[in-house]
């Protein structure tokens, strides 16, 4: 078995007694002080995550027309200095990956999921899009939480929400994956120490991928491989708002048919008021409509179990019945985000 890839911050993680997990071929910190504590750091103050395992690709703006044929969102009319969340779709309209684009005057930075990095690169090359893969030559740090911008204003210019900035050292955006405000910062390995020294001397706490997952779930954000996959379209995942590309793109015929007919599987958010947790793969029914849990966990903030479930078609009731280890547990579909 090949050795795991190591983050450029691996020695920092060891020094700070991180517990590691193998994620998409990378050895990454799962937690330091514990997932619940780290979850609380980000919800109440600030925390920072090493997300250097995520793929980072530069694409020249001359490729935008070709790139537009592969994603469901309108990147052609994206302003310089803005970020865009979008989804690469296949010919069936399903998700190859969900990604973030940062657009600058002459190029775009594409950030993709670690597990899909090779797949996205191959997909771009297959469609003759020239790229510059920069994952190994950079690090990516996410600083998140209600106090994160106040903290980082002592170090960087703070852009508007969903905007991106590039200076001589840092390329960053006011984006994130926690439901809190914050920055995602890309930096060359030569300049990484300055950023980490600032963060470690500040009030921000290091956080691992365990808290990142509970935070994203609590914020009603999808995770590729669970709420999105090569068998789930953006429409089925409740991400119709991302479909802003008015031109033809790969799988757009399928997606438009789903929008017009409503005939498709559908993802729903749910809560369970008891202590029972409906985890990934748990069977669930909404009346006679069967479904399966894609993600489920306990919410430290809401003090209840929450999750996503994928149903074969639109449920006719919000009342749910889960089969949790042979025991029937009641829950309900909710229409709003878990956290407002």
Where are these regions (language model features)?
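Conserved, structured C-terminal
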Residues: 1-24, 28-30, 36, 101-340
């Amino acid at each position: 078995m090949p050795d795991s890839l190591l983050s450029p911050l691996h020695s920092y993680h060891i020094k700070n007694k991180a517990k590691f997990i193998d994620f998409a071929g990378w050895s990454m910190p799962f937690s330091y002080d514990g997932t619940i504590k780290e979850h609380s750091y980000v919800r109440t103050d600030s925390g920072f995550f090493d997300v250097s395992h995520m793929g980072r690709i530069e694409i020249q703006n001359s490729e935008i027309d070709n790139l537009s044929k592969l994603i469901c969102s309108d990147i052609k009319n994206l302003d310089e200095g803005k970020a865009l969340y979008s989804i690469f779709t296949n010919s069936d309209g399903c998700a190859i990956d969900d990604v973030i684009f940062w657009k600058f005057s002459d190029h775009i930075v594409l950030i993709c999921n670690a597990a899909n990095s090779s797949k996205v690169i191959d997909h771009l090359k297959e469609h003759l899009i020239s790229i510059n893969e920069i994952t190994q030559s950079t690090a990516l740090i996410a600083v998140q939480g209600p106090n994160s911008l106040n903290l980082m204003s002592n170090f960087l210019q703070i852009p508007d929400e969903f905007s991106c900035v590039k200076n001589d050292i840092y390329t960053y955006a006011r984006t994130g994956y926690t439901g809190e405000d914050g920055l995602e910062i890309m930096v060359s390995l030569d300049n990484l120490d300055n950023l980490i020294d600032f963060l470690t001397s500040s009030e921000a706490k290091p956080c691992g991928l365990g808290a990142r997952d509970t935070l994203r779930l609590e914020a009603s954000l999808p995770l590729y491989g669970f709420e999105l996959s090569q068998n789930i379209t953006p429409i089925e995942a409740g991400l119709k708002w991302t479909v802003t590309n008015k031109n033809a793109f790969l799988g757009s015929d399928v997606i438009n048919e789903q929008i017009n007919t409503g005939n498709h599987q559908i993802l729903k958010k749910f809560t369970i008021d008891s202590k029972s947790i409906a985890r990934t793969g748990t069977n669930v029914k909404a009346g006679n409509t069967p479904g399966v849990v894609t993600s489920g966990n306990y919410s430290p903030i809401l003090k209840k179990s929450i999750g996503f479930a994928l149903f074969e078609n639109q449920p006719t009731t919000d009342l749910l019945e889960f089969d949790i280890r042979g025991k029937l547990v009641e829950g309900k579909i909710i229409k709003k985000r878990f956290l407002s």
